[in-house]
Amino acid sequence: MRVLCCLDGTNIEHISRALSTLVIDAERTIGLLYVTDSGPHHEIERKREWLLRPRHPSGPLQEKIQHAEAGASQDILQEGLRYLPQAETLSREGRPEQEIIQCASEWHADLILICPRSPASGGPTSGPKSVGHVARFVLDHAPCPVLLLRQFAH
């Protein structure tokens, strides 16, 4: 079974616990996916163009931003490998909801594991607003079954 695990930088422990109860090691291939969201860059530019003159990050500023994002992505994937050393790491850049669907299809995933929303984003833990837009899109468009991993109530 090919299981694609969607990382957000805070959920690897939760995902590794769920994986240990779902499928035995010998019967699974794990992919750890982290998507660097390009959406905020475009949103900032649209706001800037509306309020001020257009200014696109260029030169050293753009390089710093890209370097920081690449470093964060690698850190998150390395943390994932600490919990699941046999996993394959997959890194993408773009809109997370679309990249997850595309990666699941290209990687031939049998199952996608995703949390309803990042704990850092706040929001309700149950009810219709408890599932964020990324998880909602994945649930609606995935090419395979999706397991939504909610946090345990303490």
What kind of feature is each model-predicted range?
Residues M1, D110, P143:
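Conserved acidic residues
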Residues M1-G59:
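Small/aliphatic-rich secondary-structure junction motif
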Residues R17-S20, Q78, R136:
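Active-site phosphate/pyrophosphate- and oxyanion-stabilizing loops and adjacent acidic/basic residues
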Residues G31-L33, E88-R92, L147:
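General small-molecule cofactor/ligand-binding pocket signal
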Residues P54-A72, G122:
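A short acidic, glycine-rich active-site loop
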Residues E79-I112, R117-P119, A153-H154:
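Structural beta-alpha unit
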Residues L111-D140:
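Glycine-rich, Arg-bearing micro-motifs that act as flexible, cationic patches
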Residues R136-H154:
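Short, flexible loop segments at boundaries between secondary-structure elements
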